[in-house]
Amino acid sequence: MTAAEIAEVLGMALSTVSGILTRLGFGKLGLLGLEQPVRYERGRPGELVHVDVKKLGRIERGAGKRWRDGLRQHYNPTYTDLHGRRRQTVGWEYVHIAIDDHSRLAYAEVLADERATTAIGFLTRARRFYRRYGIEIEQLLTDNGSAYRSRSHALACRKLGIRHLRTRPYRPQTNGKAERFIRTMLAGWAYGAIYASSHERTHALDGWLWHYNHQRRHSAIGHQAPVSRTNLLGSYT
């Protein structure tokens, strides 16, 4: 956790927490290999929105384990298909995320795959989400995945009036804000609690996103929540 996150959880002033960490020898990030990277930032909400996908293993019956007679045993749920073959039911889910470069306002959905049609549907709903905060997506930055290189995705961006940019090949750090948001999301939501099922984990996502956007203070934007930088009051054109 960062000093800002500790201060928020404990209800203490950030300066107080920072002072305590410094006295304990945790004041210099360089000693821990956590130097703050040099970051850029777009000048207004919507000028650039980062989009990415994170693959997560499905959770079924306690994440693939079960208890019987007080003993934990491996559990591999299967079913028989129409041809009489045994199939495993546990697979993957795909968390599609969008984060605004200027405000850090974020949107995410858990979806079944990362195909072009799915990515287009996500983009359409993400655009609707940002418009509720007075933000129009001008440019979109993604990696070079097949969904984002498809003709249908290009046509969708054109129809929505969005300029599509892609990262340099083999340089995922170009989309660094998306990568950092995914790490935060995994720590705070996906791995931040014990879930009995994928459905329970998915159900918890909206609440975590609301906290991230409305309450969680972000050091890169003056220790304010992302919503504080949105266009609800018409500050940007």
Question: Where is each model-derived feature located?
Answer:
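Basic, flexible linker segments flanking DNA-binding modules
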Residues: 1-70, 146, 154-156, 168-172, ...
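C-terminal domain-tail junction helix/linker
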Residues: 38, 46-47, 54, 158-162, ...
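Active-site-proximal, Lys/Arg-enriched surface segment
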Residues: 55-91
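Active-site beta-loop-alpha junctions of metal-dependent nucleic acid enzymes
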Residues: 75-78, 84-95, 109-134
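Coil-to-beta-strand transition motifs
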Residues: 89, 101-106
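A short acidic/small-residue loop/turn micro-motif
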Residues: 100-102, 112-116, 145
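Short small-residue beta-strand/loop micro-motif enriched in glycine and branched aliphatics
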Residues: 105-109, 165-167, 191
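RNase H-like polynucleotidyl transferase catalytic core
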Residues: 137-144, 158-177, 193-196
